[in-house]
Structures are given as structure tokens and as C-alpha cells.
């Protein structure tokens, strides 16, 4: 049975006790019987018959999980704007307040027009690197809802107050005319006043 010996470098040699091959007392070692100090076999050390290239140290190319070169994945495309931002409510309320302030009823939008305009605005914003602040959008949505609720009420109140004021003016006009017609004529103190005395026919 073949034994193993090692030299000072930690390389083990498999002794071929039965071969008897030696030159001048020095044993001839077959390279195929050399094993590393870690206990691997000689055939695993990479023989010429395997036909495989020696494996290089380090991580294989493309197998790592690290970030790839180039632009980061987060910046490869523009950030999309969330669809539900309440833009249509904001636009609806803004046009409603503008129509009330300018007294132009044609500026007010209905729900379908506000929705179509909001969709167009969001489509344009989706092509830009925009990330809306959720807090700002929440406050804007609250403002839009409040304006859509209270805006029509304020406009209706103003219209009713204006109508009542106009009705009061119309009701006061006939009264003023009646008072003016019933007013007696006054004597002009500058005009000469001649008192007619009774004339006696007797002389």
C-alpha cells in the first residue's frame, strides 16, 4: 500500500512502494500522485487530460449583485406623477371662484370639463421628473373640496342679496312718486300779492 510523505513546503507526496523506481537512491515521483496540503486529490489539481482551463480567483463576471455601471435604475426614466391628485377638484373650484369674482358665469366648469382638463395636466406632468409633495397635494385637495362645497353657497348668497337690494329699490320708487305728486304747491314770497278789496258801487 502506498504511503504519503511531505516536504517542508507542505506538499504531500504519495510514495509508490511497489514501483521501485529510483535513481541513485532518489525516488522518482509521479506528478499525478502529488496532492495539495488541503487534502485534495492529484487529479483535481488540474491535469492535462481534463481539458478545462484553470479557474480564476474572484467573482465571475456578471454574477455579482452590485449596482451596474451607468445611470441608477431610479433615474433611468422620469418619475411618474400619481394619477389621483385631486387636480380636477382644484381646477373646478378655481374656475368657480374666478367666475364668481369676475361675475362671468361662462368661466365656471362642469365636472366633465374639469376631469378632462385635469387629465391633460397630468399627462403633461408625467413626462417630467416631478415628485409632488404628499402634504402639499393633501392641502390642495382639502382646499379644492372646501371651495367646491362653499363656493356655490357664497355665490348664491351674493346673488340673493343683490336681488333683494334691487327689489327694495324698485318698491321704493312708486312711493317716492306718490309723495311727489301729492305735495301741495307753495306760494312764492317774491311774487307780488294783491289783495282784492270789495268795490262799492255807491259814490
Curated annotation (Swiss-Prot):
* Region described as Disordered: 1-80, 166-203
Q: Where is the composition biased (Gly residues)?
A: 39-49
Keywords, in A-Z order: Viral capsid assembly, Viral release from host cell
* Organism (species): Enterobacteria phage PRD1 (Bacteriophage PRD1)
Task: Please report the name of this protein according to its UniProt entry.
Answer: Protein P10
Start-end of Basic and acidic residues biased regions: 180-189
Report which gene this protein is encoded by.
X
UniProt function note: Assembly protein. The major coat protein P3 and two assembly factors (P10 and P17) are needed during the assembly of the virus particle inside the host cell, when the capsid protein multimers are capable of enclosing the host-derived membrane, containing the virus-encoded membrane-associated proteins.
